[in-house]
């Protein structure tokens, strides 16, 4: 009797939600960055969309992918972080599998919820580094981990050493800069002790156009520091809105698109 019970009970065991065992595609950002850079090399005009905070809302994320795929004028998609709600491995895998249906390449920033449990490890396994940069046409995109509270301020978040390196190695073909982060300065998650220093770093890059962020599940356009630099906030995917940016040679346009 004991043997029978032991054998039948084996089927009841499931992987722990934080086991961090990743199946399927990895290094998504690296692979998609190569596609973006190759397709836009030498161009001075392009268009990208932004979505953010897709945690829990799998149906809405599926609908966003379908809406974006109906267009033929978008070059890539940026995700502002919080793919997961609890940092569980399966949440990242589910989101990756949905986003991989996009016809265009996409990249993901890390959100504060993505740090929970073993979330940061899984994010790195599937998507890659939490600070990274790439060049689309003549624009340098700098993607930052700004979730300082999740480290209890024990690590340099935002990472000014990374920013120093990016400025020192700024590509010759890049003429403008755009920043993407999950939490903006002033957020309870941001290290607001250095918010003014951070803004000066951002402004010190060549022709900084604007900053993008998510986190608060709202849509807004704010001049956070009163210096003319706009911060565009992308709402959570439950709002069924994505942001659309068209970069032109001498300017850019912005649109919030409902679907």
Indicate residue ranges for each PLM-predicted region.
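Core catalytic region of metal-dependent phosphoesterases/phosphodiesterases
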Residues: 61-136
């Amino acid at each position: 009797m004991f043997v029978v019970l032991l054998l039948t009970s084996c089927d009841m065991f499931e992987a722990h939600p934080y086991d961090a065992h990743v199946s399927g595609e990895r290094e998504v950002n690296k692979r998609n960055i190569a596609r973006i850079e190759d397709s836009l090399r030498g161009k001075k005009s392009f268009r990208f969309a932004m979505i953010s905070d897709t945690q829990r809302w799998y149906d809405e994320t599926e609908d966003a992918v379908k809406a974006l795929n109906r267009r033929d004028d978008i070059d890539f998609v940026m995700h502002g972080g919080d793919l997961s709600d609890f940092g569980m491995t399966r949440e990242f895998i589910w989101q990756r599998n949905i986003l991989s249906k996009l016809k265009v390449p996409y990249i993901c920033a890390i959100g504060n919820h993505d740090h929970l449990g073993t979330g940061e490890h899984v994010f790195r396994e599937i998507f890659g580094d939490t600070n990274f940069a790439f060049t689309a046409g003549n624009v340098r995109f700098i993607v930052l981990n700004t979730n300082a509270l999740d480290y209890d301020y024990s690590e340099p978040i935002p990472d000014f050493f990374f920013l120093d390196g990016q400025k020192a190695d700024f590509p010759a073909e890049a003429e403008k800069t755009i920043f993407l982060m999950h939490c903006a300065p002033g957020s309870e998650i941001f290290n607001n002790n250095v918010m003014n220093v951070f803004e000066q770093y951002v402004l010190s890059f060549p022709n900084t156009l604007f900053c993008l962020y998510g986190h608060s599940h709202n849509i807004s356009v704010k001049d956070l520091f009163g210096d003319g630099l706009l911060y565009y906030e992308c709402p959570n995917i439950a709002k069924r809105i994505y942001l659309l940016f068209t970069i032109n040679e001498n300017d850019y346009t912005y649109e919030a698109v409902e679907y």
